[in-house]
Amino acid sequence: MTYTIFKSIKLLNPATNLNEISDVVIHKNKIFSISKDFQTEVLKQNNQIDIYDCDGLTMTPGIIDMRVNIGKTENLVSTQKIAAENGITSMVILPNQTPKLNNPSIIDHIKRQSENTKLPKVNVYGAATKDDQGLEMSEIGLMSEMGAIGFTNGNKSIKNSLVMRRLMSYAAMINRPIIQHAEDEDLSGLNLSLIHI
């Protein structure tokens, strides 16, 4: 039987306030034991043991990245692979990609493309407003039916208060959040420390 031992690895789990250095033993792809000083002699008879010195390394539950941008030179699979290499087990894609995630068929396509893989789970935010302009509400009901877990204009704020009010009212009916980028474009770029009131 094969056992893998991660010696002296820092364990972090915010859900249980765990923050300690321990030895973690893996057997049959599951955690077999966690202890401060695991005695490997117990396993040495008739077992293959792979031991890794993990001093300075950290083990956590899977990390969820809630704001993923897919770059122009990347695609969904390459983004998932990069995420997996960095401990991300689930991710949410922002809508201002190419193509924009602004209609039900694109949301459905992304969800289907990411199913049945061993790569990180993919969720998507649908575009809150058409063309990220903040002027007209997108088809958030239909995008929700196709799997959008929330709605945002990504890295752009929704400036129009009436549009935002309509979005929040409709989103409440379909039990989906509206995520607002916290930036006032009319003020960004100004050196507010120079303005005296």
Annotate the PLM regions.
Residues M1-K44:
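N-terminal metal-binding scaffold of metallo-dependent hydrolase/deaminase domains
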Residues S8, D23, I49, C54-D55, ...:
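Generic alpha-helical hydrophobic packing signal
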Residues A15, T60, K72-E74, G134, ...:
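Active-site-proximal flexible loops/turns
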Residues T16, V68-I70, D184:
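Short, glycine/acidic-enriched loop or turn micro-motifs at the edges of active sites
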Residues F38, T58, T129:
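Residue-level detector of flexible, active-site-proximal loop/helix-junction positions
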Residues Q80-L192:
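Divalent-metal coordination cores built from histidine and acidic residues
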Residues I195-I197:
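Conserved small/polar residues in nucleotide/adenosyl-binding loops
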